């Protein structure tokens, strides 16, 4: 019998990114890791909070992504905050480079996950920073939606 396709479970999510940025487009990129980093990812010991991507010499690198050292890897362990190369098509990199050069755009990782083949992937977002009043507007809209749902729920209980 064939195995059922497993849901893609994120190893790490950057929930703060959706709060701090307007996400314009998302891209999927592979990531170059060493063995101890993959094992730490499988254990879920990844933090994307302050991570961002930068394009240097036609290549994309993920910076400030913290992957905790793997305990059993003793002296062959990796450095937790090293820059990690992302794997994307050259045309996508050129398109992103053109967008990032525009004022206000940045590359932010949204989540890190294993695909069906067991490869580690990064969901990368082309994002524009939110201002304080944009964040307040989002909070007000969320509260209004919650109030409407509460009012509707109370109306049908009669």
Curated annotation (Swiss-Prot):
Its main location: cytoplasm. GO terms for molecular function: RNA binding. The keyword Glycosyltransferase does not apply. InterPro entries: SmpB (IPR023620), SsrA-bd_prot (IPR000037). One of its GO terms (biological process) is trans-translation. GO terms for cellular component: cytosol. It is found in: Cytoplasm. It comes from the Bacteria. Keywords: Cytoplasm, RNA-binding. Required for rescue of stalled ribosomes mediated by trans-translation. Binds to transfer-messenger RNA (tmRNA), required for stable association of tmRNA with ribosomes. tmRNA and SmpB together mimic tRNA shape, replacing the anticodon stem-loop with SmpB. tmRNA is encoded by the ssrA gene; the 2 termini fold to resemble tRNA(Ala) and it encodes a 'tag peptide', a short internal open reading frame. During trans-translation Ala-aminoacylated tmRNA acts like a tRNA, entering the A-site of stalled ribosomes, displacing the stalled mRNA. This is SsrA-binding protein.
């Amino acid at each position: 019998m064939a195995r059922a396709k497993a849901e893609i479970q994120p190893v790490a999510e950057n929930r703060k990114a959706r709060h701090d940025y307007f996400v314009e487009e998302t891209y999927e990129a592979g990531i170059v890791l060493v063995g101890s980093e993959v094992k730490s990812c499988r254990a879920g010991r990844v933090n994307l909070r302050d991570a961002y991507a930068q394009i240097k010499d036609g290549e994309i690198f993920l910076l400030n992504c913290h992957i905790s050292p793997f305990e059993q890897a003793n002296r062959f362990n990796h450095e937790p905050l090293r820059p990690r190369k992302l794997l994307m098509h050259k045309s996508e990199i050129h398109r992103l480079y053109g967008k990032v050069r525009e004022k206000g755009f940045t590359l932010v990782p949204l989540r890190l996950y294993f695909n069906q083949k067991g490869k580690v992937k990064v969901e990368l977002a082309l994002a524009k920073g939110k201002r304080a009043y944009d964040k307040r507007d989002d909070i007000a809209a969320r509260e209004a939606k919650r109030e409407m749902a509460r009012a509707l729920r109370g109306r049908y209980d009669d």
